[in-house]
């Protein structure tokens, strides 16, 4: 699985090279404003654009060691999704290690290593939470701030769930519905993802036994991460084509545990 591309929050394709721009057409008032900006430590609240060879991307300024830097604003949807994929990169390896190196009931002799469990579940939780964040950040970006959420009885919803946003609100805004037709099969996986994420965030030990977290651990071991990653990509790209793309560099990057020498 190749690593996903990171993308800017906004970009505009251009059919000219930035070197072709004529400085003489810039109004004097704009030149004065630009000079004042460059010589002050005040950060801009206006749009800042970075001109590249084939496109313009939006960014923001940041003071670092008395220097005003211009940084590209990366779309958080692509950050969260990349985090999820990179967390998954070594997940199957550590799952296999955990299951093959653990003690078998009725047998003795295996050394118990908490790191085998810890490493797998760290990456598993990271992947789940970032996949959910991918969906929720996409919903929050798509839905206008002033949008009024209404339930099926016509009453206002004060705190809509992410499921309501994904399955009720976005289809109304986009006039297309991911739950219809051939995409239906992905919804069950997305529902399971959201439920598992909620179980993790609101984790509370079961009171019936002294191993209060075994339920969530079993669910994480059983969860189909690869299908969930594909389902989230399908959902996002259904509404915003090609927002989630694999990089063409051919390299696979993954988060891993590293022993400092």
Describe the function of each predicted region.
Residues 1-121, 249-261:
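Extended intrinsically disordered or low-complexity regions, especially N/C-terminal cytosolic tails and loops
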Residues 40, 44, 83, 87-97, ...:
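Surface-exposed polar/charged interaction patches
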Residues 72, 112-126, 182-185, 217-220:
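Non-transmembrane, amphipathic alpha-helical segments
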Residues 80, 123, 130, 186-189, ...:
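Amphipathic alpha-helix face/heptad-repeat signature
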Residues 120-144:
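Short, hydrophobic, well-ordered secondary-structure elements
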Residues 137-215, 234-239:
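Flexible secondary-structure boundary motifs
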Residues 199, 211-261:
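Amphipathic, Lys/Arg-enriched alpha-helical patches that create a basic surface
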